[in-house]
Amino acid sequence: MASGHNQYCLGYAQVKHHEWRSAENSSNHLLPKLQVIVKDNPKLKLLDVGAGSGTISASLARYMPEGEVTATDISDEILARAKDYANSQGVTNIKFQNANVFELPFPDSTFDVTHAHQVLCHLDAPVDAIKEMMRVTKPGGTVSLRESDMYMWCIWPEIPALLKFHQLQIKNIEGKGGQGKGGRQLLSWALEAGASRQDITLSFGTWCYSTPEDKKAWGSAMKDRSLTGFAREKAIEMGNATGDELDEMAKAWEQWLETEDSSLGIMNGEALITKR
């Protein structure tokens, strides 16, 4: 990212659980609006900022077969993974570009829709990022945002080590300059970025991990994050957890995965901004 701004604070190596995400389970607030836009303008241009593994980008592209999606991220490695995913799904109306959300390499008023999912919560200056997304969006276009509220996890059973893991995620993201309460702050950020209240539609949506398949996508990734990699190293370095505590958290995620009635719900703030 640009000098003076923090990067994605959890690292890029352990993002397998991101590939569970789709337009349907992670950008559902945008879909009715997108379908209306596609009907009126089949060849629309959509920018996906911080696309990561590209699963949402590819599923959005299916809703606009005559349009074009530009998927961006600051990691060439993750963009290569996103391109491979799109190719595997037969999605051809998508291109990939390394880009920094604070300095998007596009002219003013380029895109009909600008989309960002779980991007602002990792940034130290989310309002500046929204301003930049609004800049590249056409007048009358839509900026779509969805951000987790890290404080709003509902986990069962309440295994003590998992409750500690939840608090650790908050400490890690906020300790690196991110936004633990991003979901509930979207309206405030959008207003500060210059949008008028009547041009902002706010909602809240959830993720639910309760089926064996969904739980595996999340729980296995959190177990791995506890055992190895960048997130573990940073947690220890920042003094937020010890190695032994992280090992206990990994065991707790294994227990959660093996428990038939376990579940996890996470609240997300959602905003649609009309650019004027």
What are these regions (language model features)?
Residues 1-24:
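Class I SAM-dependent methyltransferase Rossmann-like catalytic core
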Residues 127-142:
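A short glycine-rich, Lys/Arg-flanked "PGG" loop and its adjoining helix->strand segment in the class I
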Residues 144-225:
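Conserved catalytic/acceptor-binding region of the Class I
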Residues 102-113:
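A short acidic, Gly/Pro-enriched loop at the edge of an enzyme's catalytic core
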Residues 112-126:
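A short SAM/SAH-binding and catalytic strip from SAM-dependent methyltransferases
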Residues 2-9, 167, 199-264:
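C-terminal helical/coil "lid" or tail adjacent to the Rossmann-like core of SAM-dependent
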Residues 19-44, 59:
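Conserved alpha-helix/loop element of class I SAM-dependent methyltransferases that forms part
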Residues 37, 44-49, 53-103, 128:
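Class I SAM-dependent methyltransferase SAM/SAH-binding core
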